[in-house]
Structures are given as structure tokens and as C-alpha cells.
UniProtKB/Swiss-Prot annotation:
One GO CC term, this protein: cytosol
Name of the top EC class for this enzyme: ligase
SUPFAM superfamilies: Glutamine synthetase/guanido kinase (SSF55931)
Keyword annotations of the record: ATP-binding, Glutathione biosynthesis, Ligase, Nucleotide-binding
Identification of the protein by name: Glutamate--cysteine ligase
Amino acid sequence: MSALLTHRLALLAKAPHLPLLNQCLHGIERECLRVDAHGHLAMTPHPIALGSALTHPQITTDYSEALLEFITGTDQDPRNTLAELEAIHRFTYAKLGDEYLWSPSMPCPLPSEADIPIAEYGSSNIGRLKHVYRQGLALRYGKTMQCIAGIHYNFSLPEALWPVLQADDGDTRTERDYRSARYIGLIRNFRRYSWLLMYLFGASPALDAGFLRGRPHQLEALDADTLYLPYATSLRMSDLGYQNNAQAGLTPCYDDLSSYTESLYRAVSTPYAPYEAMGIKDAAGNWQQLNTNVLQIENEYYSNIRPKRVTATGERPLQALRARGIQYIEVRCLDINPFLPLGIDLAESRFLDAFLLFCALADSPCLADGECGAATDNFLKVVKEGRRPGLQLQRCGEAVPLGEWAGQLLDEIAEVAALLDRSHGDSRHAEALAEQRAKVADSSLTPSARVLEQLRTNGESFSQFAMRQTLAHADYFRSQAPSADELQQFETAARQSLERQAAMEATDTLDFDSFVADYQRSLSL
């Protein structure tokens, strides 16, 4: 373990500082497709009983009208975060009728591209902007890729911790700039080590054969309806034969916040010739993308982790980051575990806390020449063949066996987990870490291996397995209907969200073309 990490852990172990570690904040976003009783994509509108997808704080849609997204608030205790996520699931199932929530990350058998419904958000300008943005995604990348679901894990260190660390570092920057620099350091370490998360939690080694729509690929056929790779952990996070040339040069190496925001600003303000050839509007004059830039908006940039700041009404993410710095990070590379009703559990959450705190406290120099590329290569190697016996990764220009490096990382993360346990007065982070050690010792315990074992043992296709898990989880949630109080709270939130959407639609005065022009201009102000 580095001297710096040892020093920082000793600092935080002191009596005045140790309780601060209880104040890390967590939030979870879980996406899932609505499907019918046959395991096919639901072609119905977003259920009105769930409220407005535009304005509801907890239940919205992602790309497709059928791709639900559940959003928890933030809490210091991940048990509360998961309890809130479960309550959202139970309410949703109380209103879903004969539809279901698809269990894994990779989608059910999909209809033709043209028939995948894009999410609708009503007639307000902001609602139309969200819809046109999604039309642009369809135009640029196709609809099929947008139907993949995942878990997003939001995490922040306690605000009171930053002055302690800054004073210890002897750093003279403003607290805002110091905090942002340290979060960027966390992100650099995440880039170095996130392959470990793919090995431990990747759960998409197989997919429905129709997903690739006849594109060339390097996958193997498990049966007539299933494609897979024998040692894959997360095909969701691989390229799957899809290339994104526009974003190819966009991977920032996260030297500092200003270089990150500058890179993103260039992407949302620089035209890209192939998109210019498509045009903003189609031949009939209908909007088909917001603009012809490399990115229509900041969130189009596809990354495994994002620096984040809560935005004010009408404020864009870049403006918020520039004005007030980084507030938290969003981990975006986590597969949904199809063996878990929520797709994530407490053990995973507690390990993520220890892992992310390790990334924040460990030494994190800027990624040197070649290190940025090596981090990307390691990640892609693990998602495609992470369970291959003897697999080697690149570390500091040298080959190292995955198992050896994973063991060394877990030894260091164990010290962070022990500190978290001292702060909480229990041993739950150490127990979560022990579960991950077992997976490194025996790859058959990983979710990806367990998925393939189920397919082979039961002679099931991917979609048959997925529907079996979907039905089991539906039974779980429907057997625990919301209490009368919960039902009333969710129904009130749904009704209020519909009222907010109606009010927005009634008060819009600007025409949509002018609204989009103002939105584009807002970044240069």
C-alpha cells in the first residue's frame, strides 16, 4: 500500500474525523424495459398511473417509451437507498397490469428498428426537446443500442471531509477547486481500476441473437436464439460491433476539471460532417436532431463515470460544473444483476463505497502517455474475456495476471473497508469485500459465469432465462404490495407530476425553434 494512502487512512481514523465517513451519500438509478406476458417489448404508452415521465422525481423513462428509469434520492445509509428503490418497484408493479419489468441489462427480443417507440414527454418545449434529442440518438446510433439497461450509482464524499484533507495536503486552492480536483483524481483511478468492477459484477455474457440485427460480430452461438462469449463478463459494456466514430476522439484523460469541461464544450459546439449531411430537420421539415454537432447535448457523451453537479432550473450540466465544481460522481458501467430483484444488493453497494473511497484516497497522478489507452484496453479485455484463465492485463507497461492484480487491489480496498466498518461499528464492508475475494478465487461465482451456467444447465435461451427471472421477480414484488400509506404517497406524487406537466404545457409561449436556439446559445453565455 502506498505511503500516501496509509497516511490518509491514519488521518481519517482519528476520533474527530472517523464519524465523517458515515456521511457519504448514495443514490441509485435503475433502468428496465417494460415487456408483455410473452417477453416482448411493451408497445403501450408510459402508464399514466405512474405519473409524468417528464416531471416525476422517481419514475421516468430513458430512451424508449418502454424503458423505465427509477431514481432514488440520496441517503447516507445504502439500506435506505435500496429500500426506496424497492418501494418504487412495488408501486410500479401495482400499476403495471399484465406487463413486467425485464430483469437483465440486455434487452428482450426487439421489434424492428422503426417500431421501437421513442419516449414521449408531452407538448411543452422542454418535453419536445427531450423527444427530439432521442430522435437524434436514433438517427446517429440506431434505436436498438438505446434499449440496453443498467444501474447508475451516484456517490459523494462528505462535504466536511474536504477541509480535513485539504489542510493535510497543505493545498491553498479554494475549497471548490480542491474538491473538484480530488473528484477528478477519483475518476482517474476509476479509469485505472474499473476493470475490477466488470469482473466482479458484470452480468451480461449473453444476449438475444436478434439484437445485432445481422451486423458482423465476434460472438459465438450458444443456441439458435442466443449469442455469447464463453469468458465474457459484460457484453453490455463492449463495442458489440457498433462503432461510434464521432465520439472516438473524445475520451478525456481527466487531467483537471477545466480540460474535461473544455473537451465536452468543443463536442457540443463543433459540427460533425456526417451529422450535417443528415440535417437538423427531415425533408418534410420535421425535427430529427437538436443540432449537427459531435454531441447534441452533454449527456450524449458515453462514459463509464461522470463528474456531476445538481443543476438549477434551465441550467445545463456544463454550466453547473463550471460555476460550482464537482458535487458527486455517477458510475455508469454497472450491469443489472438478473439474479437480484432490484438488480443490485447491499453487498455490491458496500463494496462500491469502499472501492470509490479507495479511488478517492489513493495516489492518483495524471494518466501518463499510453496509460489512458491501457486503461481502456484493460477494461475492454475484461468485459469480453475477463474469466479467461490466466488472462493478463497491462500495468505500468508490463503484463500482470488479472487474478494477481485483483488480489492486490482488494488488499488495499480492504484497508478502506476496515475504516468504514470502524466508522459504522460493524463488519459489513469487510463481509462485502470477502464476497468479492471469493469471486477472484473462483470465477464460477461471478454473475456472468452464473448466467451461462443457468443457460447450459436448463437448456434455455437468453430470453427464456431472462423471462424466468422476470416472472420470479414480479412474484416477489407483487407478493409485497405497497402499504396504504405508500400507495397514497406514490399516487399523490404521480398526480402532482401530471399537474406540473400540464402547467408547463399551458404556460409555454416561445415557439420550439426559438426555444432550441436559446438552449444552444445558453452554453456560450
